[in-house]
A protein has these predicted regions:
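ATP-dependent NMP and nucleoside kinases share a basic, alpha-helical "lid"
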Residues: 83-86, 90, 94-151
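Hydrophobic anchor at the beta1->P-loop junction of P-loop NTPases
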Residues: 4-6
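Small-molecule kinase domains that catalyze NTP-dependent phosphoryl transfer to phosphate-bearing small molecules
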Residues: 60-64, 103-109, 117, 122, ...
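Walker A/P-loop
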Residues: 15
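N-terminal phosphate/diphosphate-binding loop that engages ATP/GTP or pyrophosphate donors
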Residues: 23-81
Length: 208
């Protein structure tokens, strides 16, 4: 078994590339951010603070789908409202510790491509391969804006840009597990190369 850690800020393209990479390698893809979104969704729907239900909630991840207490919530967690709430919840140490342990358990059962913001630094510091994807904030905001429009959501580019800058600040400055490039991680600027070139670079690194 082996593990691939992919970190980077919101909108850097890590989810897209992680899915493609896992498919090419025929191993499990794990979107850790989706787990935080699932916690955020449950908190929103129940009105209960995460610390009061975190040890009782069931989160499963298989076939690229996220299940919350047995329900497929893959689509319900992909909104800007849930994204913002997940960012706030991710600062909670108890929530982070719970999900990190769950993510590590997954990696011990099978080979994984795991993506998030603290995979190479906290979740899987001994990962066999580490990558850090990034792009200019305006490039990432444009991607996020286009995603929202494609899903039929109302969005204004300037507001998306402001929200993304806030998200970056929160991710990079939180006390627990801030977003940083892991030691030994290969840096890739996803604004400068195509998706195919990014995938090839990762595959060449892993396959030698």
């Amino acid at each position: 078994m082996y593990s691939v850690a992919i970190d980077g800020p919101s909108g850097s393209g890590k989810s897209t590339i992680a899915k493609l990479l896992a498919d090419k390698l025929n191993i499990t893809y794990v979107d850790t951010g989706a787990m935080y979104r699932a916690i955020a969704l449950h908190s929103k729907e129940t009105g209960i603070e995460p610390v009061d239900f975190i040890s009782e909630v069931e989160i499963d991840y298989h076939d690229d789908k996220v299940f919350l207490n047995g329900e497929d919530v893959s689509d319900k967690i992909r909104t800007e409202e849930i994204s913002k709430l997940a960012s706030k919840i991710s600062k909670n140490l108890k929530v982070r510790e719970f999900l990190v342990q769950k993510q590590r358990k997954i990696s011990k059962k099978r080979s994984v491509v795991m993506e998030g913001r603290d995979i190479g630094t906290v979740v899987l510091p001994e990962a066999d391969y580490k990558f850090y994807l990034d792009a200019g904030v305006e490039v990432r905001a444009k991607r996020r804006y286009n995603q929202l429009i494609e899903k039929g959501e109302k969005a204004e580019f300037e507001q998306v840009l402001i929200d993304l800058k806030d998200r970056d600040f929160n991710d990079m400055n939180r006390e627990n597990s801030p977003l940083v490039k892991a030691e030994g991680a290969i840096f890739i600027d996803s604004a400068d190369i195509t998706l195919e070139e990014t995938l090839d670079k990762m595959l060449n690194t892993i396959r030698g």
